[in-house]
Design a protein with these regions (language model features):
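Generic internal hydrophobic packing segments that stabilize the cores of diverse globular domains
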Residues: 52, 56, 81-88
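Gly/Ser/Thr-rich loops at beta-strand to alpha-helix junctions
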Residues: 14-16, 73-82, 101-104
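A glycine-rich, hydrophobic loop/mini-helix early in the fold
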Residues: 21-77
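Structural beta-sheet core signal
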Residues: 9, 28-30, 97
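Long, charge-dense
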Residues: 83-114
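Short coil/turn connectors at secondary-structure junctions
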Residues: 2-5, 64-66, 92-93
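Two-metal-ion RNase H-like nuclease active-site motif
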Residues: 2-19
Length: 114
């Protein structure tokens, strides 16, 4: 691994499920080591199915430089899941999804029922 690898990390913007707004932002931050070098964003549907496609597009804007992809979980905008295998196959970059806490299966089940 290089001394200062170039990574792109993704997370979604906050949103309110009770609002009539149906989109939120998918935000990517490109860093070289600890230095931020670029920020990219795309709108994604809340509980939609476009996060994978949008994430791939954002990576491709920087693919010449980016060496690794990091994501905060595998869901964005509620239940808009990303397909890690498809992302890897299309951009040929290692991708790591990070959870900062244990998933509450009961809360997920309740949200899906609603």
């Amino acid at each position: 691994m290089k001394d200062h690898p170039i990574t792109i990390g993704f997370d979604d913007a906050a949103f309110n499920l009770k609002s009539k707004v149906r989109n939120t932002h998918l935000i990517g931050v490109v860093c070289q080591g600890i230095r931020m070098v670029n920020v990219v964003q795309a709108d994604i549907e809340i509980d939609g199915n476009d996060a994978t496609e949008k994430l791939i597009g954002l990576v491709k804007q920087n693919e010449e430089h980016v060496q690794y992809i990091l994501t905060h979980t595998i869901t964005f905008g509620g239940f808009n899941f990303i397909d890690l295998e498809r992302i890897f196959n299309e951009v040929k970059k290692p991708i790591i999804a990070v959870n900062d806490r244990e998933v509450n299966i009961e809360a997920v089940s309740n949200a899906l029922i609603k």
